[in-house]
């Protein structure tokens, strides 16, 4: 179970190109980059983790209006019970012409018994 793979499956139908870490090809007018933020275990009384918490930043880059894409992403995340922990407009980069908007998400995965 991986939040990165779950996000790719969930958001691919929206039609925005997706990469993990960095966009390696020539950047299109709008694209998403997934950046893993942290993987943590919740503290349990027996010191054995029962839940794996994974957090990822979704960075949306858009040369035009980003609001329709942002709203579609947020709707998809909320309908899949993925926790949105933060949303923030980062700014407009005049040199590249891209607006940059971040959405941070978290998902809790039950640990598998060995």
Residue ranges and their predicted role:
Residues 1-55, 61-114:
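Long, contiguous binding/interaction regions
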